[in-house]
Amino acid sequence: MTTPWENHQKLLEDLDRKQKEREAREQRERQEAAEAPLREQALELAKTLVDLTRYRNERNLMLFPFCSTAKAKRIKSIRYSSADGRHWLEVTANYEYGMAKIWDFDILRFALSKAGEVALQVGYFPASVEFSGYECLKALGRNPESGSNLKWIKEGLRRLCLTGYSGNIFRENEKITEIFTLIRANYTDQSGKLERISITFDERLVESVRYSKGLLVIDKTLLCEEAGIKKRLLELVRVSMGREISWTVGIERLQALCAHEGTLKRFKYELKQYALPWEVTFSKAIHNGGNVTFAAEGNAPKGEQ
């Protein structure tokens, strides 16, 4: 049973939190008003052909399991909770089209990369971008004339738009559950070449980039990776390591972060098959199935290989 003093403290904490949220919101509104001319310039540039100097993705999309890593259609939801229980994410598939796949996210990576390039030139990250199927496929290293690739873009956009999310990943207030999708999209396809595609980012992605420096550079080779789990690891491990020389994680948690649906034994076997840009070592543990460490070459701990 809580005491009057504890109730008073809780009330003060809630008032303080609400004041901080209000001040942050007012600051964003003032910033938006000041940046109005840049916004219009950025939105216009985002409709034109822009050469990419680097490829990018949003930090949370790299850290958490936002998509399926399997080639097959996935209907089963992803339910992830952080080790401390403070952050959680549920990913829900559309029954007809299935869950967004990690390869579909290449379309989103391209769109974020283009928006990031616009921000680099103008100083403002646009909330939407436009491009052609040819522009997107060429940037992703795929044959831009291929009918199957153009079909993939249309199917991928549908999965990206219809995959639903709920959780508290993007917000500081962990008590609030948000329900959202990552993008809205439309396209024009009168010639069969997808001459115009428009993607509007969810406000959570936009705010992460504008206010939290959430847009990170990624290696272009990631876009060419065909193995779903390896593709996931190339982003997850790099962002988790940060500037450190290694990253250690429980193998069960890593399996959850990779949205792997098989057994733990199978997941560990698959990990050992990949040629990764880090030294990978496994250590045994009594309760959680053991740990796996990814380390820069020459810095791996001794353990079970």
Range-by-range predicted roles:
Residues M1-Q305:
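Charged, alpha-helix-forming regions
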